[in-house]
Amino acid sequence: MNNDEISQENPPVHMILCADDYGISPAVGDGIRSLIEAGRVTATSCMSASPFWREEAAFLLPLMDLADIGLHITLTDQVPLADWSSHSPSGKLPSQKELWWMAIRGQLPEVLLTEELDRQLDEFIAAF
């Protein structure tokens, strides 16, 4: 079997491999950047609500031509960018289970969710 036959029988597959949670911690950021540099991942999603985001974003800038970079929308378990004090006395976004129950009961605070999403997007854009 020659190369022409192989390529016709098994055309190359374009695959995107995304490393999630960039920015959640410096260690995760180091690992994802290493994978991007090695060509092992082709994309990453960034947690702009993380307290490490701004610093980690600066480290990612030189790699922007090597991978697709997107926003990881964070709605659970992290410190919010919007004021959730009326819905979360702990100072954190609700747990996944709590958010799920809020959705089932029709109790999602839509205005607050919109504000959180807007702030996360603004933080993401501001870093680049």
Outline where the language-model segments fall.
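Boundary/entry segment of secreted carbohydrate-active catalytic domains
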Residues: N3-P26, I32
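Acidic (Asp/Glu)-rich catalytic clusters
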Residues: S7, I32-A38, R54-D68, S85-P94, ...
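Structural preference for beta-strand elements that scaffold enzyme active sites
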Residues: H14-I16, V41-S45, L66-H72
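Active-site beta-loop-alpha junctions enriched in small/polar residues
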Residues: D20-Y22, M47-A49, H72-T76
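A short alpha/beta connector and helix-capping loop motif
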Residues: P26-P51
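Short, structured active-site "lid" loops
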Residues: P62-P80
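Active-site gating loops and adjacent loop-to-helix segments of metal-dependent hydrolytic enzymes
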Residues: V79-P109
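CE4/NodB-like, metal-dependent polysaccharide N-deacetylase domain
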Residues: L112-F128
